């Protein structure tokens, strides 16, 4: 079995820069492929701001929560299909060709959204982009992983995660840049065509993965690429490892066959693949059920829930969370090969659970202390302006004590804040563009998604802390684990299965978030995510081994007998890898 590797394989960011400085070709490969991560991040993040303006242009979107959820989640639905096809396509045609196809899909989707004249056209464009996101989500880290020396593999794969978060941060900047430009959301959604074109051109100049080439009997090309990546004295050892993997793969195929269904059956009958999938799917599902993409897809909306009514203000504040996510990815690059994948994820999950519980408490307090309804102001605001649900109480001596701003919004009405003091009682009125304009004309603020709150700043603080603890661990590490935990012969297939599990979980979360907040409130929704995060933490501890510093072939040996955490493992000299 593999001996404990942490001391001998420790690495710091200085070595990463030294290696890539001496061999700049490695960084060129990583950054070019990583643009797929940038596109992934941009196209999933840009909708957070664009949705606010899509709602303003299309009344039916503003009035239908389910339509908003479809626009947001259709990219995720497309990504499920893209990831599923991508696994097969990667193995059949190679990593490089898969990236090129993803770029074409990104470009087509962007063009469709730019010319959209109705919500269904936006949905179609989001679907096309989703196909590209799904392929990029598994292909970019896989390509980088197979092009990287083992000692800095984790850090270089983290560049893909960094570019995902960088793409999300860029999308928020672009959103702010086009706030006052005619066609706001069209520009926001269309800008993604530019990096797609750039990556397409760059990938035309780069080679295929040496591992895929060797598997497809293009050994001379594979050797040529390895000689450009590894020092001369390491090339033969790497080729020997590839030869052994391909020999084992060929032997397997002679037994299980060559078709997709045969490979799937063979993969599931292989204990190494089964144990790898248990770990890979666990981290992918856990990544989504901490609720991260509710923050990334809906962060301006969440901040409006917290009391920031202005679109521009909400987007500017949301930029903070996106920026912290990008910074956290840099931190991951610094520590993932020093402290290990497993430890970073476990620490990250503890922090996530803490922040989610506190956020639930913050939103609960904000709801309980929302401004009361001023009966006279609601009745006299304008002719036929009073919220229909509140109108019967305007004639009573005093309205029910449970009527506050939050109660008003629950009946799909709007709250016009008190002109003198935002936290004082205000008017509960009909929600319409005319009433919003009238409220603003009186120098007051109109709220329709959240209420004025003294707790709003706490929501920003703990959303920021949530991102800080998420990004270095659960943000990037699941993709690293899935790029190195499967045998070469099943890597594309198993990586596709794990990526599909990620996107299916993502779809569940993004498609239900607004519905959940309507049903149980923001507080209850964050509490649900805290509970699902606790479940995810347990299964990560139970099923996910440490792969830091291991060759792909060593990972296979680690998984042969199944992984058990040290607490559940008999103490023997044959313990595989020290894990917490």
Swiss-Prot record:
Family: Belongs to the major facilitator superfamily. Sugar transporter (TC 2.A.1.1) family.
Cysteine pairings via disulfide bonds: none
Source organism of this protein record: Arabidopsis thaliana (Mouse-ear cress)
Gene Ontology CC entries for this record: membrane
Membrane topology classification: Multi-pass membrane protein
Keywords associated with the record: Membrane, Symport, Transmembrane, Transmembrane helix, Transport
InterPro entries noted in UniProt: MFS_dom, MFS_sugar_transport-like, MFS_trans_sf, Myo-inositol_Transporter, Sugar/inositol_transpt, Sugar_transporter_CS
UniProt GO molecular function: symporter activity
Protein name: Probable inositol transporter 3
Biological role stated in the UniProt entry: Plasma membrane inositol-proton symporter.
Superkingdom of source: Eukaryota
Main location: membrane
Any Pfam family: Sugar_tr
Compartmental location: Membrane
Signal peptide span: none
Keyword Transmembrane appears in the UniProt entry: yes
Gene: INT3
Residues that span the membrane, as ranges: 34-54, 69-89, 104-124, 127-147, 161-181, 187-207, 289-309, 316-336, 344-364, 455-475, 493-513, 524-544
